[in-house]
C-alpha cells in the first residue's frame, strides 16, 4: 500500500509516500501542512509525519508500534493506537515540526477493523471506539451417533 495525493481540479494522482513497504491511514493536520500516517518502514507499524506538500523530511512520533493516527482539532497532538492502548504525542507544527514524548491515555478492548477503528471529539477528551464483537454462545449442538462407523 502506498499514499498518493489526488488534485481535485485535474484528478491527477501524484505520489506522496511510495515505498516497498506499506503506508496507510493518512491524517492531514488541521493547518494542512503535515500528514501523519502508518508505515512499516522500520519492520513494524509506526506513526510517521511528513510535510505537505511532501519533502524528504520524515519524523517518527510513535515509540515502538503504532497505527491509526488522528490529529487533534487544534493540531497540538496526534492520537494513535498501539494494540489495545490509545496514546497521544504532543506536537508543534510552527515554526518547525517538533514531537514530544508519547503518553498512554487509556487501554481497553476494541473492535479491530481494516482502517481507522476510532474517532475523537473536537476537544480531544472523548474517544469513540468500535465495540469488540460479542462472542455468541453456541445455539446448536450436533450429535453424531455411531461416529466410529464413519471412520471406516
Task: Mark where each language-model region is.
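Beta-propeller blade-edge and WD-like acidic-aromatic loop motif
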Residues: 1-15, 33-34, 38-60, 74-77, ...
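Conserved beta-propeller blade repeats
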Residues: 16-38, 59-79, 110-126
Amino acid at each position: 500500500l502506498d499514499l498518493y495525493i489526488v488534485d481535485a481540479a485535474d484528478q491527477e494522482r501524484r505520489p506522496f509516500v511510495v515505498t516497498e513497504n506499506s503506508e496507510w491511514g493518512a491524517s492531514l493536520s488541521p493547518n494542512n501542512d503535515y500528514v501523519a500516517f502508518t508505515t512499516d518502514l522500520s519492520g513494524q507499524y509506526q506513526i510517521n509525519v511528513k510535510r505537505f506538500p511532501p519533502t524528504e523530511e520524515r519524523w517518527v512520533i510513535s515509540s515502538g508500534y503504532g497505527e491509526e493516527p488522528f490529529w487533534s482539532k487544534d493540531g497540538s497532538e496526534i492520537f494513535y493506537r498501539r494494540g489495545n492502548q490509545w496514546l497521544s504525542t504532543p506536537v508543534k507544527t510552527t515554526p518547525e515540526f517538533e514531537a514530544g514524548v508519547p503518553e498512554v491515555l487509556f487501554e481497553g478492548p476494541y473492535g479491530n477493523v481494516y482502517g481507522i477503528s476510532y474517532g475523537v471529539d473536537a476537544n480531544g477528551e472523548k474517544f469513540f471506539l468500535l465495540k469488540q464483537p460479542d462472542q455468541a454462545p453456541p445455539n446448536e449442538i450436533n450429535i453424531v451417533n455411531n461416529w466410529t462407523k464413519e471412520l471406516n
